[in-house]
């Protein structure tokens, strides 16, 4: 298999404030977390895991041949859960890169995962994350995050507001991160920062501490499921692609 020095970890906890038992919600006849895992697994990496605190989630994943790492339900963030899972991977001394894929993107494209792995390995960034160009109308309809970058694509700032102010085209941030191992270790050792707490965005802890995040353009905005309304959109999208035989 390719990229033997890379682990992909999908953090997934059962409890959710906005959508009850979110990972187990159905899209068609298949749960959200199974759809995420199936998409990620198509990237073809041996070290692909779901990190969870839930026997129910674990059962869903193991039934389709996936690997599960159990982590404590008290772990505060997805990145912390990713790191705790990484420490439990057998022979993890051979893993130099860790990709954190959020467990709420049921149609994430495997090509996007492979693209950020290649970009991370061929750059000097601590962390790499995907972005998509979107227009004002598209991003206004989204509750997600935009990013400002410099001419080389290095992230300058992430915000839940539209940045830069006054623009007609924006860079939408996709919730997936490729970490160098030492960068992930450093990140979890740092305390939450002012901007991170203000914007409620973990990646600002990275920038406030002088670490670097490179951005990698991908083509499509994946659907993220955080609310009941998001779930309805995901179900509708699935129904549409099913009719087309995709």
Swiss-Prot record:
Its main location: cytoplasm. Activates KDO (a required 8-carbon sugar) for incorporation into bacterial lipopolysaccharide in Gram-negative bacteria. This is 3-deoxy-manno-octulosonate cytidylyltransferase. GO terms for biological process: CMP-keto-3-deoxy-D-manno-octulosonic acid biosynthetic process; lipopolysaccharide biosynthetic process. It catalyses: 3-deoxy-alpha-D-manno-oct-2-ulosonate + CTP = CMP-3-deoxy-beta-D-manno-octulosonate + diphosphate. Pathway: Nucleotide-sugar biosynthesis; CMP-3-deoxy-D-manno-octulosonate biosynthesis; CMP-3-deoxy-D-manno-octulosonate from 3-deoxy-D-manno-octulosonate and CTP: step 1/1; Bacterial outer membrane biogenesis; lipopolysaccharide biosynthesis. It holds the Pfam family CTP_transf_3. Belongs to the KdsB family. InterPro entries: Cytidylyl_trans, KdsB, Nucleotide-diphossugar_trans. The gene is kdsB. Keywords: Cytoplasm, Lipopolysaccharide biosynthesis, Nucleotidyltransferase, Transferase. It is found in: Cytoplasm. HAMAP family: KdsB (MF_00057).
């Amino acid at each position: 298999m390719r990229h033997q020095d890379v682990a992909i970890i999908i953090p997934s906890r059962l409890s959710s404030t906005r959508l009850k038992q979110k990972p187990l919600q159905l899209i068609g006849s298949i749960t959200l977390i199974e759809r995420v895992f199936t998409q990620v697994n198509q990237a073809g990496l041996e070290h692909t895991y779901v990190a969870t605190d839930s026997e129910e989630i674990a059962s869903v994943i193991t039934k389709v041949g996936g690997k599960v790492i159990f982590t404590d339900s008290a772990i505060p963030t997805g990145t912390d859960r990713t790191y705790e899972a990484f420490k439990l991977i057998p022979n993890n001394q051979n893993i130099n890169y860790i990709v954190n894929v959020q467990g709420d993107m049921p149609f994430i494209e495997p090509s996007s995962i492979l693209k950020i792995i290649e970009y991370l390995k061929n750059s000097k960034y601590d962390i790499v994350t995907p972005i998509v160009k979107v227009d004002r109308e598209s991003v206004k309809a989204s509750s997600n995050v935009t990013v400002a970058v410099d001419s080389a694509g290095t992230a300058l700032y992430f915000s839940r507001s539209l940045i830069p102010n006054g623009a007609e085209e924006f860079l939408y941030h996709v919730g997936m991160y490729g970490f160098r191992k030492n960068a992930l270790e450093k990140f979890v050792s740092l305390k939450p920062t002012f901007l991170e707490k203000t914007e409620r965005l973990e990646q600002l802890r990275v920038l406030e501490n002088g670490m670097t995040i490179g951005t990698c353009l991908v083509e499509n905005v994946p659907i993220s499921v955080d609310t009941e309304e998001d779930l309805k959109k995901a179900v509708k999208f699935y129904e549409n692609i099913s009719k087309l035989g995709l």
